A protein has these predicted regions:
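Structural signal for the C-terminal ends of transmembrane alpha-helices
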Residues: 15-18, 74-78, 107, 135-140, ...
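Helix-loop-helix hairpins in multi-pass membrane proteins, especially solute transporters
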Residues: 1-91, 118, 201, 278
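Phenylalanine-glycine-rich, low-complexity intrinsically disordered regions
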Residues: 81-82, 97-120, 135-137
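Peri-membrane helix termini and adjoining interfacial loops of integral membrane proteins
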Residues: 69, 312-324
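Glycine/proline-centered helix-kink
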Residues: 8, 35-47, 51, 100, ...
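12-transmembrane solute porter fold
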Residues: 61, 105, 118-130, 139-313, ...
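Flexible interhelical linker loops that connect adjacent transmembrane helices
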Residues: 70-97, 139-154, 215-216, 363-368
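Intrinsic disorder in cytosolic terminal tails and internal cytosolic loops
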Residues: 82, 322-327, 355-372
């Protein structure tokens, strides 16, 4: 809950503080690099705690960091409040939360009970109904949770849709690759944490490059090729087997994926806040974060279904492998999921290609105008 409050607030503060697009791009680059560094520390620390203490320690390790950040925020972050109607959209909150829960749980149930299960169908139908009601509410309430003017602008709407698809394709990669490293290759939790460092290093390095290029070339020339590169990196992961080497088959994929995703994340953050008013920056930032998280949840649930089905089918068709069948079946399930993940990233590239129509000139003009 508190992370959901923090992430949009951080992006909103950057947006209203850095009004010059070149400076804002650098600020987003710094955020990207810090996030990458934090991810590296988290993977290693989480692996160490899991291996040498208990996984429960991972749930409390953020407490001292959060306390320190809160103290610094009180000292350095200036308070700001939205003007006008500040009432809270309770009906919107209820229908949106229930709708997204039903959608995610419906995909989850499909993995265990199948798409024809009455429970799966019931949750998915309920999700559609609740989300339609949510949109109807947002059109009528005075202070909507999600003002439609924020998402109906072409570039912002495309950014949120692209973020949803990218989250669906990327988040599941970490799940399946982590399982491959630990279950198939036998990596310890700590070693698995170190194994993801190439991805982190790629994000840190290319986030700085993306922040420098964004004001010069605009967002689309970075995001579309970036997603294509990331998709290629995912496709390279389909070469893995229970006997392949981490250095030759996993590291190159992680480096290609991370370089591509860094070229996406920085411009995507900028386009998601394109031409938005100060009053709506918090909502626009929250939409970006929400679309990523919802995409990750839906993608993980959906691709878990895909991987489980592929694993079961392979095991049934190759029973002659005996005791070796499960490692090969699980790896096959992972590779099928990676193919679907790559397809989602390619779909994201198509979405951003057709929706994003701002160049470097309009990025400067519209963003400069909206904050002065």
């Amino acid at each position: 809950v508190f992370a959901a409050l923090l992430a949009p607030a951080a992006l909103s503060i950057i947006s209203v503080t850095f009004t010059v697009p070149a400076e804002r791009a650098k600020a987003f680059g710094v955020i990207g690099a810090i996030s990458g560094g934090g991810a590296a520390i988290g993977l290693i620390l989480g692996g160490a705690l899991t291996e040498y203490a208990s996984w429960r320690w991972c749930l409390g390790v953020n407490t001292p960091i959060a306390i320190g950040a809160a103290i610094l925020a009180i000292k350095f972050v200036h308070e700001s409040k939205a003007q006008g109607d500040n009432t809270y959209d309770i009906p919107g909150v209820i229908t949106a939360t229930a709708g997204l829960f039903s959608l995610t749980y419906g995909f989850h149930e499909a993995a265990t009970k199948g798409w024809s299960s009455s429970l799966t169908i019931g949750f998915l139908v309920s999700a559609v109904f609740l989300l339609v009601i949510f949109v109807a509410i947002e059109k009528r309430v005075a202070n909507p949770l999600m003002p439609l003017r924020v998402v109906t602008e072409r570039n912002r709407g495309g950014s949120y849709l692209g973020s949803l698809v990218v989250g669906a394709g990327l988040f599941s990669m970490f799940l399946f690759l982590g399982l491959y490293l630990q279950v198939i290759l036998g990596f310890s939790p700590l070693k698995s944490g170190f194994a993801f460092l190439p991805f982190t290093f790629g994000i840190i390095i290319f986030a700085g490059i993306a922040s420098q290029l964004l004001p010069k070339v605009g967002p689309k020339p970075l995001m579309v090729p970036g997603l294509i590169f990331a998709g290629i990196g995912l496709l390279l992961l389909t070469r893995i087997t229970p006997d392949t080497s981490y250095l030759t088959h996993v590291v190159p994929s992680l480096l290609i994926m991370s370089s591509g995703m860094a070229l996406v994340f920085i411009p995507l953050t900028s386009t998601s806040l394109h031409a938005v008013s100060n009053h709506d920056t918090g909502v626009a930032s929250a939409m970006l974060n929400t679309s990523q998280q919802v995409g990750g949840s839906l993608g993980t649930a959906l691709l878990n279904t895909v991987a489980a089905t592929a694993t079961t089918t392979f095991a049934a068709a190759n029973s002659q492998l005996g005791e070796k069948v499960m490692p090969f079946a699980m790896t096959h399930g992972f590779t099928v999921a990676f193919k679907f993940s790559a397809a989602l990233l390619f779909v994201g590239a198509v979405v951003l290609f057709f929706f994003i129509n701002i160049g470097k000139e309009s990025l400067v003009e519209t963003e400069g105008a909206s904050f002065h």
